[in-house]
C-alpha cells in the first residue's frame, strides 16, 4: 500500500504537469504572431513611402502613418519613428519612394520639391498675367498647389514677424530724458 504523502505528491505533480502543458499550448498560440515581429528585431510601422531625408518634416508627416507629432514652441518634433535614418545617395531625384506604385497621391507628392529646399515659394504667374490671359479656372491639382503656396507664404510671413519682434529695438536717449 502506498502512503498518503506519496499519493498526495504524485497527484500534485501530475496536476502541475497537466497545467504546464496546457499553459504551453495556449501561450504558443498567442506568442506565434508576436514572435514574428520580435524575430525581425524592430516594430514594423505603417509607411506610405520612405523619405530621402528625415529633415523634410512635411515628407515624414506624409509618409509615416503612425507617428505622433508633439508641438513645441520652436518646432514640431516627430516621435515614434524607430530607427535612425540610413545614409542615402545625395543625388536622389525624388524626395521619397512610394511603397505602392498604385498610389497616385504618393507619386505626386514624392515628385514635388520640398519647401525647405526651395527656400521660398516657387515663382508662378503674377496675378496681372493671369488677369490678362483671362484663365482663372484651375484644376484640382493646381488649386491644391495654390493653397499650399498660400500656406507657405503665410508661415514665412509669420516667422519673419516673430524674428522682427525678437530683435531689440534701439531707443534714442532723447526720449528717455523726458
Curated annotation (Swiss-Prot):
Q: What is its main location?
A: secreted
Annotated region described as Disordered, given as residue ranges: 159-178
The record's Gene Ontology cellular component field reads: extracellular region; extracellular space
Q: Where in the cell is it found?
A: Secreted
What is the superkingdom listed in this entry's lineage? Eukaryota
Matching SMART domains: END
Q: Indicate whether Lipid biosynthesis appears among the record's keywords.
A: no
Q: Which residues form the propeptide?
A: 25-46, 70-178
**Bias (Basic and acidic residues):** 160-170
What tissues contain this protein? Answer: Expressed in lung, but not in placental stem villi vessels or cultured placental villi smooth muscle cells.
Which PROSITE patterns does the protein's record reference?
ENDOTHELIN
Biological process (GO) annotations?
angiogenesis; artery smooth muscle contraction; axon extension; cell surface receptor signaling pathway; cell tip growth; cytokine-mediated signaling pathway; endothelial cell migration; energy homeostasis
- The record lists its disulfide bonds as 49-63, 51-59
Region span, Endothelin-like = 96-111
What is the annotated signal peptide range for this record? 1-24
Protein's name according to its UniProt entry: Endothelin-2
Described purpose of this protein according to its UniProt entry: Endothelins are endothelium-derived vasoconstrictor peptides.
Amino acid at each position: 500500500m502506498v502512503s498518503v504523502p506519496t499519493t498526495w505528491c504524485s497527484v500534485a505533480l501530475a496536476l502541475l504537469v497537466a497545467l504546464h502543458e496546457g499553459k504551453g499550448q495556449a501561450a504558443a498560440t498567442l506568442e506565434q504572431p508576436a514572435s514574428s515581429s520580435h524575430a525581425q528585431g524592430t516594430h514594423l510601422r505603417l509607411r506610405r513611402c520612405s523619405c530621402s531625408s528625415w529633415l523634410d518634416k512635411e515628407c515624414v508627416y506624409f509618409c509615416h502613418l503612425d507617428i505622433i507629432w508633439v508641438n513645441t514652441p520652436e518646432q514640431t518634433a516627430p516621435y515614434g519613428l524607430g530607427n535612425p535614418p540610413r545614409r542615402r545617395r545625395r543625388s536622389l531625384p525624388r524626395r521619397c519612394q512610394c511603397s505602392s506604385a498604385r498610389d497616385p497621391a504618393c507619386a505626386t507628392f514624392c515628385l514635388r520639391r520640398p519647401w525647405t529646399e526651395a527656400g521660398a515659394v516657387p515663382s508662378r504667374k503674377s496675378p496681372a498675367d493671369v488677369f490678362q490671359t483671362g484663365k482663372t479656372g484651375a484644376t484640382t491639382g493646381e488649386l491644391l498647389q495654390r493653397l499650399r503656396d498660400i500656406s507657405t507664404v503665410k508661415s514665412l510671413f509669420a516667422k519673419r514677424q516673430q524674428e522682427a519682434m525678437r530683435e531689440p529695438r534701439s531707443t534714442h536717449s532723447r526720449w528717455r530724458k523726458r
